[in-house]
């Protein structure tokens, strides 16, 4: 996900404030449509000043706008964290651990209905920033989403209280947070557009083509159940559609995976 820096008082930042307040209501609407706190491993308190500075300079646009005191404060409240595959790090509005920069791995952000059905809103990858794990740091906003680690993940966690304090003190930190929330809102809108207005054949083709493009591999190592969660469908529906793709010679199925054999045909179906 591309990051852009915003200066104090920018029009985009004002739009972001409005987006943050409508985001929660939109997610509640989505939840209507789709009808154990996990421990994290924290290595030793704060990270070293040198490693933190390198990380912040590379991935946080606001770093150059912090005072020396704010930089020291941020470093002392940043930790390296590790999550196992399948581990849940955020349970709706029940917790607020902080802002996480993903060094390596993947997070899945999803809605969970009262009946236990879930739908994936978006995923985050290497070098993305997870802001929704610090939803309590965002004024008057509660994001009722869950976040899982979809693979072994290493990240750098800024404690929620520390990030909130910096947002209150520094407009550039607040603008950075607003930018990410707007990006998340855009991702959610795209997901719901697919679920509401795209046929399952096109949604599945688009997902497979995007995964192939992202990984650079024609072998997609996912179960039918995983794919169903990602595209907001049922496993049985995905399985039937994959069999149709096989009959059209677009893919081949194997145990625990899918091989794309006709990229162009899949691309045309994905649109």
Please tell me what each predicted stretch does.
Residues 97, 101-110, 127:
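Glycine- and acidic-residue-biased ligand/ion/polar-headgroup-sensing regions
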Residues 89-94:
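Short phosphate-coordinating micro-motif centered on Lys-Gly-acidic
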Residues 39, 43-84, 134-138:
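Cyclic nucleotide-binding regulatory module and flanking cytosolic helices
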Residues 150-152, 168-233:
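Polybasic "coupling" helices that flank or enter modular domains
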